[in-house]
Curated annotation (Swiss-Prot):
Annotated binding of tRNA, by residue: Y14, F68, N70, N116
Entry function: Hydrolyzes ribosome-free peptidyl-tRNAs (with 1 or more amino acids incorporated), which drop off the ribosome during protein synthesis, or as a result of ribosome stalling. Catalyzes the release of premature peptidyl moieties from peptidyl-tRNA molecules trapped in stalled 50S ribosomal subunits, and thus maintains levels of free tRNAs and 50S ribosomes.
Keywords, ordered alphabetically: Cytoplasm, Hydrolase, RNA-binding, tRNA-binding
Name recorded for this polypeptide: Peptidyl-tRNA hydrolase
GO biological process per UniProt: protein quality control for misfolded or incompletely synthesized proteins; rescue of stalled ribosome
Catalysed reactions, as listed in the record: an N-acyl-L-alpha-aminoacyl-tRNA + H2O = an N-acyl-L-amino acid + a tRNA + H(+)
Site annotation Stabilizes the basic form of H active site to accept a proton: residues: D95
Major location category of this protein: cytoplasm
Organism ancestry: Bacteria, Pseudomonadati, Pseudomonadota, Alphaproteobacteria, Hyphomonadales
GO molecular function, one term: tRNA binding
Site feature location: Discriminates between blocked and unblocked aminoacyl-tRNA: N9
Top-level division of the source organism's lineage: Bacteria
GO CC terms: cytoplasm
Subcellular location: Cytoplasm
Length: 207
């Protein structure tokens, strides 16, 4: 069993926010691979399914913590304990302001870089889980970071975000087989990041 978790906030108010990029990717994986119905457990919405990989068919648990973004570790750690898993069995998808819109990077270990969801995960699980960082760009002003990530994706964002979610689904077997580099390369090949300034989306406003 491997866990794929998204970071985000529960409720319709936040559903299309940049901060909910992780939830949106998990939803797309759920639909693309025909996972089972969502149910409530571990203070989260969870769904089980399988994905065919080079190493054989892999059981996967999808998790969307309902604890709000800054407490996601509390929910995921409950699932890890229940299934007797290790932090290395966990992959978390989350938005990343320090990456340009449309960029994706895989990270294992290291610091939380100010991401409170990652901070919560590390507090509960340590540093040895995998993070899939989805670039949403920086607004250019520290005071605007929260309004930026708690705003909905704009139309210009969807031009790269939707292809990226599709690419993540197609490349997912590489990730589940432990080939982080191949997964990252394949996603960026299938959905190249737009060639614009990292702050462009924020400047465009509601474009």
């Amino acid at each position: 069993m491997l866990i794929l978790s998204g970071q985000g906030n529960p409720g319709a108010k936040y559903a299309k926010n940049r901060h909910n990029a992780g939830f949106l990717v998990i939803d797309r994986i759920h639909d693309a691979y025909g996972f089972g119905p969502w149910r409530t457990k571990f203070d989260a919405e969870i769904s089980e399914g399988t994905v065919e990989t080079a190493n054989g068919r892999q059981r996967v648990l999808l998790i969307k913590p309902q604890t709000f973004y800054n407490e996601t570790g509390r929910s995921v750690s409950k699932a890890v304990t229940f299934y007797k898993l290790q932090p290395e069995d966990v992959t978390v998808f989350h938005d990343e302001i320090d990456l340009a819109p449309g960029r994706l990077r895989v990270k294992r270990g290291g610091g939380h870089s100010g991401n409170n969801g990652a901070r919560s995960m590390m507090a509960h699980l340590g540093e040895n889980f995998r993070r899939i960082r989805i670039g949403v760009g920086h607004p250019g002003d520290k005071a605007m970071v929260m309004p930026h990530v708690l705003s909905d994706f704009h139309k210009v964002d969807l031009e790269w975000f939707e292809p990226m979610t599709e690419a993540v689904c197609k490349a997912l077997p590489f990730l589940l087989a432990g080939d982080d580099e191949r997964f990252q390369t394949e996603v960026m090949r299938l959905a190249p990041a737009p060639k614009h300034d990292p702050k462009q989306t924020a400047r465009k406003g509601e474009a």
